[in-house]
């Protein structure tokens, strides 16, 4: 079977259209844009695009680019980026890309198929960088503008991870690194619209790439990223010091909008699901009845109302994003909803010693909504005899501990993809689980289940939509019946932005990209749409 798709969305390229109001014609004197992408008192100097933390939330898309861009707010939309088209062969085990001509790295070297082949071979040889667990067999340049990547298994379903989630790095620089997995890349060279111009622990800046392959883009000449803690950011937003932020704001009308809705805007599209993660290497949390009792005790409606200020909704028990994911939900669970049942929870825990029901709930201190949610969860679980100590830690510490399995309970989000499968795979695929002490790139609860992995493999082995939906429905049943994670609420893509300097921001009417500055590569797509506001 051979399938070819020439991606014909040239008009959807990020630089070719914009929305949001009138704009000026010349950006030579355009002002810098001040951005807050992640809560941090200090920054760590690490621009390896495969290190999923710190400054790389958002900025990797500005420096390093992928072969294609997938708009999660418009399922099915695939936009040519560093590649113009792709072609499957060998029953989904080989994928050939035709690359965009005339692209250069920011050091002036040409971008070629050798760079793409090197990147995928690097992912094959260094499991720590292969965050999507791609089963790469080999990659080779067929011509300066053509590259083929071969896989050990049918990989139709992984196109998003392959083409949209694998930033391409320059071979001529990265091949000199003995261990690219530990390479911090303090002088990044990419193909993207920006390049790093200044870095300190309190502020880093990025300036426009004058040789970027989209002519005349970007129109924002300079990006500034000051370090703000969550509390400091609230003050900065009130005082107009930040132009674009991605944060939970307790009272957004008072703190940010301030009676100027045309100037101070926000857009919170659903981005995935936030769950309570039980570390399943803990023998007590590995017991299904304990997880079921926890789920029955938690008042999710109150969490959404109090901790999330009503900005989102309680998640469906399958974890499937709703509305929009109905076809991927098992028919028998279409109308399922979480209900609090303290009596039943207590009944389920009768065979468990109270001494065993003591856990620490780890949360990132800067995420004030999650901190508040953790307190509510603690109170709810206490009603059924489960003792929980909530512990807030620095963002980087939380990323490290959850990734390495050094926790008992935690709260974490799972990002959505072109279909619910990608979120479910991230949450449940056994191939992403690592031994405690090794950093995982998903499945942080370390769920290992043969049926789960079989369903994930069935989805990946076909390009038949009905079969893919059937496999995802099976994963939904596992979520409802086995509770490997406890879905809480849908994760909004937090985004606050001002139109005083630039217009063209994403909106509900024009959702051309996720609006959050911490989302890669969407943040770069947003910047490529912006135009100076008319004064």
PLM ranges: what are they?
Residues 34, 87, 98, 131-175:
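Surface-exposed binding/hinge segments that line
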Residues 72-73, 164-217, 222, 343, ...:
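Gly/Pro-rich hinge or "lid" segments in bacterial periplasmic/extracellular proteins
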Residues 211-255, 387-389:
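Ligand-site clamp/hinge motif
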Residues 256, 281, 285-325, 373, ...:
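Periplasmic-binding protein-like
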Residues 313-351, 367-370:
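Structural transition elements
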Residues 338, 389-397, 427-499, 534-535:
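Extracytoplasmic/peripheral linker and loop segments enriched in polar/acidic and small residues
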Residues 495-535:
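Long beta-strand-rich cores associated with HINT superfamily self-processing modules
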């Amino acid at each position: 079977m051979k399938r070819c798709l020439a991606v014909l969305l040239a008009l959807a390229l990020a630089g070719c259209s914009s929305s949001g109001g009138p704009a000026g014609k010349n950006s030579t004197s355009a002002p810098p844009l001040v951005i807050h992408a992640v809560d941090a008192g200090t920054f760590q100097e690490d621009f390896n695009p495969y290190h999923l933390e710190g400054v790389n939330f958002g900025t990797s898309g500005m420096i390093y680019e992928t072969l294609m861009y997938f708009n999660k707010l418009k399922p099915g939309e695939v936009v040519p980026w560093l590649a113009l088209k792709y072609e499957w062969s060998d029953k989904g085990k080989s994928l050939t890309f035709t690359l965009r001509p005339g692209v250069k790295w920011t050091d002036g070297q040409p971008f070629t198929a050798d760079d793409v082949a090197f990147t995928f071979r690097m992912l094959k040889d260094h499991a720590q960088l292969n965050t999507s667990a791609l089963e790469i067999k080999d990659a080779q340049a067929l011509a300066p503008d053509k590259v083929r990547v071969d896989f050990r298994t049918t990989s139709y379903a992984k196109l998003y991870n392959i083409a949209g989630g694998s930033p391409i790095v320059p071979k001529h620089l990265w091949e000199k690194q003995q261990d690219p997995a530990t390479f911090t890349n303090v002088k990044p060279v990419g193909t993207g619209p920006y390049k790093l111009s200044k870095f300190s622990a309190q502020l880093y800046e990025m300036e426009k790439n004058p040789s970027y392959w989209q002519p005349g883009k970007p129109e924002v000449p300079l990006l500034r990223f000051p370090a703000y803690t969550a509390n400091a950011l609230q003050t900065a937003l009130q005082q107009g010091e930040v132009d674009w932020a991605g944060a939970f704001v307790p009272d957004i009308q008072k703190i940010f909008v301030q009676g100027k809705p045309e100037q101070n805007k926000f857009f919170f599209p659903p981005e995935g699901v936030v769950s309570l993660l039980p570390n399943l290497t803990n023998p007590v949390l590995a017991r299904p009845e304990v997880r079921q009792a926890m789920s029955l005790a938690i008042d999710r409606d109150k969490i959404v109302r109090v901790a999330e200020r009503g900005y989102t909704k309680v998640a469906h028990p399958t974890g499937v994003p709703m509305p929009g994911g109905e076809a991927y939900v098992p028919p028998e669970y279409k109308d399922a909803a979480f209900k609090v049942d303290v009596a039943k929870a207590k009944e389920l825990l009768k065979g468990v010693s109270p001494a065993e029901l003591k856990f620490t709930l780890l949360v990132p201190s800067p995420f004030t909504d999650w901190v508040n949610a953790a307190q509510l969860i603690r109170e709810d679980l206490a009603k059924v005899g489960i003792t929980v100590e909530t512990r807030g830690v620095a963002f980087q510490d939380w990323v490290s501990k959850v990734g390495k399995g050094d926790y008992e309970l935690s709260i974490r989000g799972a990002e959505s993809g072109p279909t619910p499968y990608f979120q479910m795979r991230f949450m449940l695929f056994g191939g992403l689980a690592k031994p405690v002490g090794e950093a995982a790139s998903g499945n942080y609860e370390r769920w290992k289940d043969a049926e789960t992995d079989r369903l994930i493999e069935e989805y990946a082995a076909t390009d038949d939509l009905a079969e893919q939906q059937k496999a995802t429905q099976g994963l939904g049943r596992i979520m409802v019946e086995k509770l490997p994670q406890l879905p809480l609420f849908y994760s909004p893509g937090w985004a606050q932005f001002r139109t005083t300097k630039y217009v063209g921001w994403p909106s509900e009417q024009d959702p051309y990209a996720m609006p959050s500055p911490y989302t890669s590569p969407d943040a770069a797509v947003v910047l490529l749409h912006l135009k100076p506001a008319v004064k």
